[in-house]
Amino acid sequence: MIKALCIALTLVCLAGCSKPGPVVLDKAGHGLQQKQRPLIVGKWYSDSPTTEGGHVMEIAEHRANGTYVVSFRVIDKTGKVKDSQEAGFWGTAGNIYFTITKGWIQGSKFIPAPPGLADLEDAYQILELKNGKFRYRSVENKNVYSAIKVDDTFQFPGIPPSKG
């Protein structure tokens, strides 16, 4: 009885020690990335309600070299406007779109972000990317964002910029 129990326990332990399968080193199979990257390059606009009763507008410019600048305009429920800008790197991996914020732009000055802050690295599942529409979901908080592609000269509509 003890011998049978020891054999069974050994088999269970060995089953958990199996080696992983081989990995593919060639990146040639990344066709999805090659199709999506050019679709994201350009300027995108979104306007979303906030849980506090206001809304946030965003103009994100994704460059072909993998850098981005995004301008935010937050309008609270009283109508107070606050503008900000951040810059960093963006990319795709499969159906994941990601950004890494490297700092903020204040006037014409770049303020670098402290290195290694997890809050400045964001990953999103791409839900839709076609016909000038980009919908994506935050992996972390599950918020869904929707943006439309706009002309390179596009600016925030109708509200004068806040005084910084």
Please describe what each predicted stretch is.
Residues 4-14:
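Sec-dependent N-terminal signal peptides
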Residues 17-85, 91, 98-164:
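Lipid interaction determinants
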